[in-house]
Amino acid sequence: DFNIGLKGSITLGEGRNWSVSKNSGFAYTGRVELFPLGRFKSLGDITEGDFEREERVKILLAGAYSFNDNTNRLQGQKGDIMPNNETRDINSYFVDFILKYNGFAFYTDFMGRKCSDPLFTGDNETSIYNGNGLNIQTSYLFPKNWEIALRNSTMFPEEKVQQMVG
C-alpha cells in the first residue's frame, strides 16, 4: 500500500497575471508526499474532514520547498509590490501530516519563510515576513455528516520583523 507522490514546478516568480520585467525571476518548487498506509479515498488528502470515513488508518507525511529568485512581491508570488522596485530571494518550506480514520481527522502543518534581508531602507512599515507558522486541526464527522472541529494557528515571527508583524 505504500505510495509516494512527487510534484515540482518552475513558474514566474511574481505569480498570476504578471508581465515580464527586467527584474523578474522564477520560483522553483518541489514537494514529496509519503502515504505509508496507502492513498486516501477520493482525494481525501486535500479535504479537511474524513468525509469518506476511511475504513483503515490513512496517513500522509509531506514536505515541500520553494525558492523564489529575485521576486518583487512581499509574499513571493503574492502580496504587495516591494518598495522602490527592489527584489529579494525568498525561501519557503512546509511539512504536513494528516491522519484519517472512520470519521476522525487530524492535520498539522508547519511552514516557514526566510529572506536574508527582510527590511527595506527608509520604510519602517514594510517587511517580508520571516519566521514560522503552525496549524493544528482535529475533527470528527458524525454518521449524519455533522462535524465538530478544533483548530489552532500560531505564527512565530523572527525577532528582526516581530515589531512589524505583531
Task: Give the ranges of each region predicted by the language model.
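Solvent-exposed loop/turn segments at secondary-structure junctions
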Residues: 12-15, 112
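Detector for outer-membrane/organellar transmembrane beta-barrel domains
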Residues: 23, 33-36, 41-159
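Internal alpha/beta core interface subdomains
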Residues: 2-9, 16-43
